[in-house]
Amino acid sequence: MTRRVAGGVAVLVTALLSAAQGSAVPTRASAQSELAAGAFAPGMSERHHYVMSARVRPLLLFWIGRSNVGDAIVTRAAAPHEARYSLLIGSDPDRAPRRINRWGYIEEDIRGDAATVVGLMTESDEESVEEAEANLQREQGGRHMFKVIHASIDAEQSQSVVTAVGAPADYSFRQVRAVLALTSDAGTAGKTRVVRLPRGTRPGFLSALAETIHAQAESARAETLHPGMPVSFVYHGKLYELRSTSAQFKPTLEVNSSKYTRAVSAQFAVKNLANGEETRFSLSYAIDGRLAEVPLTISYQPRWWMQVNLALADDVDSLQMGALDR
């Protein structure tokens, strides 16, 4: 049982970051100005901490779950005609079964009609528990590889390249800056991908999601809640569409021991516009107060037998809250 949970956590974190990392994106100046204004006032900067739990279903009849196996940190900042979003997420080897260490990071920096994206994830394309176990054994033998994406975007096109980086140790998400520093020193870059952008393409998965949530929350505050319009973005040479498939108003929402009022629970789909493949996830957020439009919960199920959940835990003392500054 523990083996299944351990492998499942590894695959879950990798799958979530594969979707989230798909956020290297450009856009037009008008759309970027709207994003920079966003849902929060220019000059503001926010950081929120989440605790991760995971569930694996070895049989069709029941789930096996583990709580507090990792963390996530979401940041957002705004200035006139500028916006910055980041997501750091991963399992914590000090808490996860078998010291599972799977994590990733993405940062989107939008300035006027230009944007840059940096994404990082542990190199582990596991499709099964068995593959996860095999990768764990290789890592114990000294193989610690990461994939790092750098993208630059303007109003017309996106250029991105993935670099393979070998780390001297089994770095966790606490060492995100150390891994990024290795890229320029010892990385092996792949072929640069260049793609022309249709008008209205947004500058990243995170910024596209923030815009979608903002429009949805505005309709909820006006008591006319609706899912909203699809938003397109680009990732490493491919175009994607983000859309909310449904949204429900919640007078109250309980998350662990916390209770929130006036929240929205929404479901989303990300579609690869080239092949039609879809990735689905759900999240909830408050529509008023200091946590307005901040995700309270996030749930993602990449396989029928696995699910990862994040819950807001700003009140939990965590050393990981300072990880982005290291």
Regions found by a protein language model. Name each.
Residues 10-11, 122, 169:
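Polar low-complexity intrinsically disordered regions enriched in Ser/Thr and small residues
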Residues 8-18:
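Bacterial N-terminal signal peptides
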Residues 134-199:
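Mixed-charge (acidic/basic) macromolecular-recognition segments
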Residues 1-9:
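Bacterial N-terminal signal peptides that target proteins for export
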Residues 25-163, 212-326:
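Acidic, serine/threonine-rich low-complexity disordered tracts
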Residues 176-228:
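Hydrophobic, aromatic-enriched interface-forming segments
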